Design a protein with these regions (language model features):
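Entry/capping segment at the start of metal-dependent catalytic domains
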Residues: 2-94, 259, 266
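N-terminal post-signal-peptidase region of extra-cytosolic proteins
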Residues: 51-54, 63-71, 78-80, 109-128, ...
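Extracytoplasmic
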Residues: 61-63, 75-80, 89-94, 122, ...
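C-terminal solvent-exposed extensions
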Residues: 65-76, 86, 97-108, 233-314
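Extracytoplasmic/secreted envelope proteins and their assembly/folding machinery
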Residues: 79, 120-128, 143-147, 151, ...
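Flexible, solvent-exposed short loops/turns enriched in glycine
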Residues: 91-118, 162-168, 172-174
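Amphipathic, coiled-coil-like alpha-helical scaffolding segments used for oligomerization/assembly
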Residues: 117-179
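Flexible, polar/acidic helix-loop-strand segments at domain edges
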Residues: 151-232
Length: 314
């Protein structure tokens, strides 16, 4: 009889532990679920960072420089452009650069030769040393990507101060525009004028035209807020998918936040500085110390003010 009572107590004791274990298991699941929900919210916030609204008055956003190097179908450097974006001041500085600029790394090689022997990273080093600046990002841009991006924006209206005429040896890539004739240039026409010897000033004329083209295209993009906002991803992919770049998708998303905010200001933020110096012949250009100082001063003037704060969302 006593043995039966003890057995009965053991059974009751075992049964009483089951609900405790069940409650513990449910609590554990709920805790894990809460952790998962918090993680999901954090990931979602980071993934949608590009849709955030930036409060520039309380946020430190440093300006950034990107070097775009246009290469032809034979992977030869055609020209390049330094683009500095200052979100805080809503300014974009464009510095067009000839591929025949002599690099300060050795005082002999041109940027085209530097790219041919060392690729885009060595070119970035040469550009930084030659102009006395620091570029944060680099990207190679194919002829097709350049034309496509220019066409998405819609080209730009151009009236040359001299007749531009050139008969191409291949593919009917001719250039023919009358003096003072206002025409809307397509991406292909812009590219051809950038690379062919159509200017009386020689290759300096090509560099100046490149500055005019990029400045006009970017300002046109800022005049078309909805079109540009909806096309940013497309243009990024055209450059990134087929080019060499250190601009990651996350870097691009962060930049897109600032660019969208600048677009909403409805301004034309872009201006250019044309490199000054000396052409010793048609294939060697040396940047003057005076221009390097001017560029340094402009870089200093377009630095962001150091402030504290975070990107805020509404």
């Amino acid at each position: 009889m006593a043995q039966a009572v003890r057995n009965n107590k053991k059974k009751r004791k075992k049964r009483s532990q089951a609900p405790v274990a069940l409650v513990y298991f449910i609590t554990l699941l709920a805790f894990l679920g809460l952790i998962g929900l918090l993680a999901l919210m954090i990931v979602d916030r980071l993934t949608n960072k590009e849709e955030a609204k930036v409060d520039f008055s309380n946020t430190y956003i440093d300006s950034f420089n990107t070097m775009y190097a246009r290469v032809n179908d034979q992977n030869v450097l055609s020209d390049l452009c330094i683009v500095r974006i200052c979100p805080e001041q809503a300014k974009i500085l464009v510095v067009p650069v000839s591929a025949f600029t002599v690099s300060d790394t050795d005082g002999v090689s041109t940027f085209r030769e530097v790219y041919e022997s060392g690729g885009i990273r060595q070119l970035q080093t040469a550009v930084d040393k030659t102009f006395g600046i620091a570029t944060d990002y680099y990207a190679t841009v194919s002829n097709q990507a350049f034309e496509d991006c220019a066409d998405i924006i819609g080209g730009f209206l151009y009236a040359p101060s001299e007749e531009l005429y050139y008969i191409s040896q291949t593919n009917d890539n001719d250039v023919s525009i009358r003096e003072n004739e206002a025409v809307v240039l397509t991406g292909r026409q812009i590219r051809l004028i950038c690379q062919y010897p159509v200017f009386s000033a020689g290759r300096q004329g090509n560099t100046e035209f490149l500055g005019t083209a990029i400045t006009s295209l970017l300002n046109n993009a800022f005049d078309q807020v909805d079109l540009t906002t909806n096309s940013l991803d497309i243009m990024y992919k055209k450059v990134a998918d087929k080019g060499a770049t250190n601009l990651s998708e996350n870097d691009y998303k962060e930049q897109k936040v600032y660019i969208k905010e600048m677009l909403n200001k409805k301004v034309q933020p872009t201006y250019s500085m044309i490199p000054e110096g000396q052409w010793t012949d048609d294939k060697h250009f040396t940047v003057s110390p005076e221009f390097k100082q001017k560029l340094y001063d402009e870089m200093e003037a377009t630095k962001s003010q150091e402030k504290s704060g975070d990107v805020s969302e509404e």
